């Protein structure tokens, strides 16, 4: 990106942010989003992990998942203190299940330490997958995580649960929790504040948030209540009409106060990349 493109980008974002502060909605989602941003502005470094995907059928009509839009909006509001990562575009292989082998729990033991200092500068990354499958990219996430004051996970709700990308990521990070629970070593994330924000259509969103909050407590994160919430189109779990799905996107924007101009801007950015 050259200087002129960067200046144009800044001008566009100033206009979009200014628009988003006009005619703000009086909704729980808008208040939650504002509170999240206010909390994260207090931090020195924030990691945002987006875990929802969307196939693009038309390059001229980019479709960005709702939870990712929230993450991108927060990213623009916070600026340079944010590291944003799209987990769905990374090679995060499945967990090998070493936590429950017949000879005991070998997840996160010292032998599993990734020895490449460029990938594991802290020396804390211990996941067997990164040894057995060198192409795996989980190290990119842990490297940023250990340098952050706060981490927020974003996902969609699918069939009443957090989606597969998020679940896979949490399984793969088990070695962090296992280190201080089973192996009796230090808790590496006790001072890292955590959050989880999800979006869904019609079922179980609040319960998903509660479950993930409890999971993060088990992991050893420092829970920040302001960073846990969800948006859901309807509470009617039997509403599967095409009409409701088509109305969902507009209602999401209205409830959160995210402007269509912001979505269009991010769509152009996605198309370029």
Language model regions located:
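Charge-dense, intrinsically disordered terminal/linker segments
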Residues: 1-33
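Generic alpha-helical structural context detector
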Residues: 12-15, 171, 214
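N-terminal beta1-alpha1-beta2 submodule of the flavodoxin-like/Rossmannoid cofactor-binding fold
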Residues: 20-155, 159-178, 242-273
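Ligand-binding pocket scaffold of soluble enzyme catalytic domains
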Residues: 36-39, 48-50, 195-197, 225-237
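A generic structural signal for short coil/turn motifs at secondary-structure boundaries
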Residues: 55-59, 203, 236
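Extracellular serine-dependent O-acyl
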Residues: 84-90, 223-231
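Short Gly/Pro-enriched loop/turn and capping motifs at secondary-structure junctions
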Residues: 98, 201-203, 233
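Short, glycine-/small-residue-rich phosphate/pyrophosphate-handling segment
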Residues: 163-165, 182-228
